[in-house]
From Swiss-Prot:
It is found in: Cytoplasm. It comes from Escherichia coli O6:K15:H31 (strain 536 / UPEC). GO terms for cellular component: cytoplasm. This is S-adenosylmethionine:tRNA ribosyltransferase-isomerase. GO terms for biological process: queuosine biosynthetic process; tRNA wobble guanine modification. Keywords: Cytoplasm, Queuosine biosynthesis, S-adenosyl-L-methionine, Transferase. The gene is queA. Transfers and isomerizes the ribose moiety from AdoMet to the 7-aminomethyl group of 7-deazaguanine (preQ1-tRNA) to give epoxyqueuosine (oQ-tRNA). Its EC number is 2.4.99.17. It catalyses: 7-aminomethyl-7-carbaguanosine(34) in tRNA + S-adenosyl-L-methionine = epoxyqueuosine(34) in tRNA + adenine + L-methionine + 2 H(+).
Length: 356
């Protein structure tokens, strides 16, 4: 399969730079997996699409203010993007600089360069940085960090993004990008879903900066997926197995919830799914056998991204590309702050040939 098979034309005007004033007021394009039929509506239509007893699985990761500006003590400006927090004092990060810092280099971070840190080691493209400060890494980031808006949102971060680029149920700090399908859920909608009898469970996947890395190979089978830490606790496993047992659906909110659930299913020895606390490099593309997820809530993804490949594996390649073509024609808003899709599983997707 070629990466170019997942390309589509997207006018720049359709990239959303700000979210809708009300979280749940975005548009919703529904794709029926088995038939490819499309329905246009608004996000709150989800209430009618879910049945009592269906299980919604959310990702409760919380975005950290992961972008830091500063300079090397020796002079040159730097930009630091945290990939993950290693402990209370150390981070693993991408560093942009005219000349990469060497181990032992002193860094002065923050808009006022008040935070002292040392680059202690290099791991491939990533740098290990230790803060010389009494406070924990998280406190330092909350104090001097900027929200790491995706590269396609071409504007500086604003104070409002600290709330807007965060799901209302976010709980566990560690992500450098929001699980964006969840941004559309507000408390009134969650309350109505609960009142209808829709069950809810929470996995954790700390989204890394690798989620924005382009696929740099021609053939997708050659792509090496970035690694992210995921947690699927026992209560989620129990909720999934109970939903399946009573004939209800498991609906993943976002591709990160999909990757968490399917990672836990892949690693399971004795059951459909078992608890999972580990890094995952799961790469889902056409031909992948889904085991857990029956329906998916997701945003519109970048051309040639691993995420549009995941959706194609779920709904079928042709159905997915047709839906994206319709979304462009109907002027849906794309990417992190954009509109959403509701997709049901296409069991025939696994047999579809792509690019032939």
């Amino acid at each position: 399969m070629r990466v170019t098979d997942f390309s589509f034309e997207l006018p720049e005007s359709l990239i959303a730079h700000y979210p809708m004033p009300e979280r749940s007021s975005c548009r919703l394009l529904s794709l029926d997996g088995p038939t490819g039929a499309l329905t246009h509506g608004t996000f709150t239509d989800l209430l009618d699409k879910l049945n009592p007893g269906d299980l919604l699985v959310f990702n409760n990761t919380r975005v950290i203010p992961a972008r830091l500006f500063g300079r090397k003590a020796s002079g040159g400006k730097i930009e630091v993007l945290v990939e993950r927090m290693l402990d209370d004092k150390r981070i693993l990060a991408h560093i942009r600089a005219s000349k990469a810092p060497k181990p032992g280099a002193e860094l002065l971070l923050g808009d006022d360069e008040s935070i002292n840190a040392t680059m202690t080691a290099r791991h491939g493209a990533l740098f290990e940085v230790e803060f010389n400060d009494q406070r924990s890494v998280l406190d330092i980031l909350n104090s001097i960090g900027h929200m790491p808006l995706p590269p396609y949102i071409d504007r500086p971060d604003e104070d409002a993004d600290r709330e807007l680029y965060q799901t209302v149920y976010s709980e566990k700090p560690g992500a450098v990008a929001a699980p964006t399908a969840g941004l559309h859920f507000d408390e009134p909608l969650l309350e109505k879903l609960r009142a209808k009898g829709v069950e809810m469970a929470f996995v954790t996947l700390h989204v890394g900066a690798g989620t924005f890395q382009p696929v740099r190979v021609d053939t997708i089978e050659d792509h090496i997926m970035h690694s992210e830490y995921a947690e699927v606790p026992q209560d989620v496993v129990d909720a999934v197995l109970a939903a399946k047992a009573r004939g209800n659906r498991v609906i993943a909110v976002g591709t990160t919830s999909v990757r968490s659930l399917e990672s836990a299913a892949q690693a399971a020895k004795n059951d459909l799914i078992e608890p999972f606390f580990d890094d995952t490099q799961i790469f889902i593309y056409p031909g992948f056998q889904y085991k857990v997820v029956d329906a998916l809530v997701t945003n519109f993804h970048l051309p040639e991204s691993t995420l549009i490949m995941l959706v194609s594996a779920f709904a079928g390649y042709q159905h997915t590309m047709n839906a994206y073509k319709a979304a462009v024609e109907e002027k849906y808003r794309f990417f992190s702050y954009g509109d959403a899709m509701f997709i049901t599983y296409n069991p025939q997707a696994i047999n579809e040939r792509v690019g032939e």
